[in-house]
Every structure is written in C-alpha cells, then in structure tokens.
C-alpha cells in the first residue's frame, strides 16, 4: 500500500515496519553490535556485516557485463555500472560537480565547509573523511601495501598505484588544452595548468618565492633549514628530496634513460637532456645583466657572474697555490706540475 506508519523521532524518516525503524535508530545512536571477526569493523545491521564479510573471501558473485569486473554486493555492482553509463545523479549544490553515489557527494560537501571531524592523533591534521584519515595514517606508519609490479615502488593507496602504473604504458588520457601536452593523471594535468595561468598559491615565508604546488614549497623550505634527509648509500652524499636522490643514484648504476632525438646522446637525468637540447635549438634564455652574455643554463650564468665580474677564483692548485675561475683551467694547469 506504500504506507509508512513508523516515524524516526530523530530525522523524521518513515518506515513500513517497526523492525526496520529499530535498525535505522542505530545510525543515530552509533550502535554497531555486529562485529566482523576478521578485521573488527562494526556494523549496525547483520545483513551489512554478511555483505562486508565477502571482502575477506574470494566470493564475488556479481559480475559487470561491460568490463567483467566482479563485486561482492549487488549494490556495489549497480554503483559501478554508473561508470559505464556516465550517470552522476548526485549534484553538489555549491560547485555543480556530479557524483555516482550519494555518500561520495556527502563526503565531497565537507570541502565547502570548515568541518573536518577526523583528527590525526600523530600530527593533529584534520580531515573531512575517515577514509582520508586512514590513508594519511600510513605516512606515519610507513605502510605502503600497494607495490608496482614493474618497478617495485610502494604506495599507500591503491588509486595512487593505478595512476602510477600509467607511466609504464603510453596511456596519457588527459591532454592540456593550452599546449597539447598529455598526462597520465588528471591531478598532474591540473598542476600543469598552473604554468599557463601563472597561479602560484604556495609562498615561502623565508624568501617570498612562490610555487604552483605545495610539495614544491615543502621541498624548497629545506634550502633554508639545510635539511638533507635522503642519503646515497653508495657515496654518502645527502639530498633534500627523495626524487633528487633517485636521479643521483643513476650516476652509480650508469643508467641513462633520457636520449636526445637529435644526436643520440643519453643522460641520467631529464633536466640534463632538456639543457642539452638547447645546444641544438640555440636557445640561451639566461642573460648576464653586467655584460649581456647569454647562457643555456642558469647555473652557468651564476658561475659566470661570480668568476668574471666578482673576480672569484674558487679552484686553487695544491702545488703552487695559484687560483683559477674554472675547474677545467685548473686541471690544464696541473699538467705543468
């Protein structure tokens, strides 16, 4: 008949029978009497526990007819199907972004408020979702359970691993509308777009330099603190960034994965290849304000300024004490002795 005579006094929602209302009340009381014996997670209904239990087994009886992926629950399959249909019926009233599930919309809505009810007990950082907090906790525990089968790098989240995996394929489905460059991840494209817009929202409080990404600022700050936590096990040299250490390691392994398409010369670092390219293009974007001489690399300009215009001679002969502006001149001089 459609009659729902049992009303929840907390939220006003109506139900057809008393038993369903009693189950519903547990949402408001927080009562979760049904505990999973495998992982300890609690649920307010027995049926929800039974569905959850399937994740601890290989039982996935609900296959997707589009892509073949299988699911433990019919409800999860129905939500998954929206990926193929493109259906996003739950729209955020603030920004208009659509979502396939109501719960995802509710979690998203918190970014438009200051509500961050899930604090990290280690560092005090707060999060809008419990799931995000749990992922964040892996930073403190060092847990990286998702391992790339290609290169062995570990990740805290499965989604990060899936995005990373694209670097081992040619799949780059996110093109920049400004310059046409393609990216494996949407997030990387969004960061790249800041190059074209000039947006640099992250500013260093020490020197005022601004950056497009928070991670770039965090790495930059180490210049002021002198912090170099990443040490090479081969030669003991330390670095402020893990990425720089990885690049440095290629010196010891002899790996040179970046090859010049003009002349075939190979390099251990991408930036070395980019600088080398300028030899072929003739590009010299760094000009000396003193004499107007141009250079392909910023570091070469900096060396030029110090040695030519300041008279600095940092390379000293240990035999006779004579100093030189360049290392190669010192090496040539050493042959005299």
Curated annotation (Swiss-Prot):
Record keywords, A-Z: DNA-binding, Metal-binding, Nucleus, Repeat, Transcription, Transcription regulation, Zinc, Zinc-finger
Keyword NAD in record: no
Stored SUPFAM superfamilies: beta-beta-alpha zinc fingers (SSF57667)
MF term (GO), any: zinc ion binding
Entry keyword Phosphoprotein: no
Listed PANTHER family: ZINC FINGER PROTEIN, ZINC FINGER PROTEIN 771
Name under which the protein is recorded: Gastrula zinc finger protein XlCGF26.1
Organism of derivation: Xenopus laevis
């Amino acid at each position: 008949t459609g009659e729902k005579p049992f009303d929840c006094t907390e939220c006003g929602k109506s139900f057809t029978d008393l038993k369903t209302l009693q189950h519903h009340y547990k949402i408001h009381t927080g009562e979760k009497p049904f505990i999973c014996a495998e992982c300890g997670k609690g649920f307010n209904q027995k049926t929800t526990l039974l569905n959850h239990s399937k994740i601890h087994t290989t039982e996935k009886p609900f296959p997707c007819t589009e892509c073949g992926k299988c699911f433990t629950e019919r409800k999860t399959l129905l939500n998954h199907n929206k990926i193929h249909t493109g259906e996003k019926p739950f729209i955020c009233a603030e920004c208009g972004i659509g979502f396939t599930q109501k719960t995802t919309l509710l979690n998203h809505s918190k970014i438009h408020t200051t509500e961050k009810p899930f604090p990290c007990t280690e560092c005090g950082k707060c999060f809008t979702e419990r799931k995000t907090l749990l992922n964040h906790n892996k930073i403190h525990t060092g847990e990286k359970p998702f391992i790339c089968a290609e290169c062995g790098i570990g990740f805290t989240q499965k989604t990060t691993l899936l995005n990373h995996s694209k670097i081992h394929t040619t799949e780059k489905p996110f093109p920049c509308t400004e310059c046409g460059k393609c990216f494996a991840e949407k997030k990387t494209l969004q960061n790249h777009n800041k190059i074209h817009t000039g947006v640099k929202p992250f500013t260093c409080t020490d020197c005022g330099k601004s950056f497009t990404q928070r991670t770039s600022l965090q790495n930059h700050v180490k210049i002021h603190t002198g912090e170099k936590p990443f040490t090479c096990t081969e030669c003991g040299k330390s670095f402020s960034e893990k990425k720089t250490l990885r690049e440095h390691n290629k010196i010891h392994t002899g790996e040179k994965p970046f090859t010049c398409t003009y002349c075939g010369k190979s390099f251990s670092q991408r930036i070395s290849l980019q600088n080398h390219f300028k030899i072929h293009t003739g590009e010299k974007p760094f000009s000396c304000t003193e004499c107007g001489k141009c250079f392909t690399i910023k570091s070469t300009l900096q060396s030029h300024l110090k040695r030519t215009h300041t008279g600095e001679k940092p390379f000293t002969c240990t035999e006779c004490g004579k100093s030189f502006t360049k290392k190669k001149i010192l090496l040539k001089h050493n042959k005299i002795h």
